[in-house]
A protein has these predicted regions:
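Active-site-proximal betaalpha loop/short-helix elements
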Residues: 103-180
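Helix N-cap motif at beta-to-alpha junctions
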Residues: 188-193
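Acidic, Ser/Thr/Pro-rich beta/coil linker or hinge segments at domain junctions
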Residues: 201-250
Length: 250
């Protein structure tokens, strides 16, 4: 049920998050509507940026390194822990593990603001892209297509927490195609990779180089993303729907 205290809690969270980023909350409207059994929040953020400082998802260059922060299936971990606790308990999960997984929304968190700021200050960044629905696999296709390049990705270097891997194994989803809000793909000059990874590490953010930009796109064909696994190359797996959506509709 909608209560005054619930409204106050939601708007206090919005105000706190905006305050941390120096963002002003302008306007707002709230109402109680039949047919909804939970709060629904919609927002839009507007801002200005120096045109010389804009970093797009379309800026990858041949020879660039591609980094990934935090890891695969961050938001998926929290969603499954919150929505399927009994299923996970049946797989031997403790209440402590469930609470930790559910808290992935805040730790490691689904914001990439700090990741982007640190990376931009530490090295020469050409492209940024945040994986969401469809996971990191889909995001790789998106950033390659936007930039008009081909990518080589090393499956063995893709970061994923032990808790996320365990959860995905237990419910039968592929973390590569599961919603990964909180992760950030960073395209950078190869020589600045270590500097960026180390700068992120000082703030407690895990990052790893997961691949390289192989070449510019050849006219007449789409961008290619290939995956190296066990010293052999294979096509990147494709996910027509997010693994979370598949899980909940089966």
């Amino acid at each position: 049920l909608a209560t005054e205290s619930l409204f106050e809690e939601i708007f206090a969270q919005i105000a706190d998050a905006c305050s941390q980023l120096g963002v002003s909350v302008a306007g707002g409207h709230s109402e109680v509507t039949t047919g909804l059994d939970r709060p629904l929040v919609i927002g839009q953020m507007l801002g200005e940026v120096n045109s010389n400082e804009v970093i797009r998802s379309s800026g990858l260059l041949p020879g660039d390194a591609l980094l990934l922060t935090k890891g695969l299936a961050i938001e998926a971990t929290s969603i499954v822990a919150r929505e399927m606790p009994d299923t996970l308990r049946g797989k031997g999960w403790s209440d402590r593990d469930l609470a930790e997984a559910a808290n992935y929304l805040t730790q490691p968190g689904i914001s990439v603001v700090e990741d982007a700021r640190i990376a931009q200050a530490a090295g020469e960044i050409h492209a940024l892209h945040d994986p969401t629905e469809g996971g990191v696999a889909t995001a790789l296709v998106e950033i390659a297509t936007a930039s008009g390049v081909d990518l080589d990705i090393d499956a063995d270097t893709l970061p994923i927490s032990l808790l996320s891997q365990r959860l995905c194994d237990d419910v039968g989803i592929d973390p590569f195609g599961a919603i990964s809000s909180g992760a950030l793909l960073i395209g950078c000059t190869a020589g600045t990779t270590r500097t960026i990874v180390d700068a992120l590490a000082t703030r407690g953010i895990v990052a790893a180089q997961i691949g390289t930009v192989r070449s510019g796109r050849v006219e007449g064909r789409s961008s290619e993303v290939r995956l190296r696994r066990d010293n052999s190359w294979e096509a990147l797996p494709q996910f027509s729907v997010d693994e979370i959506a598949r899980l909940f509709t089966e």
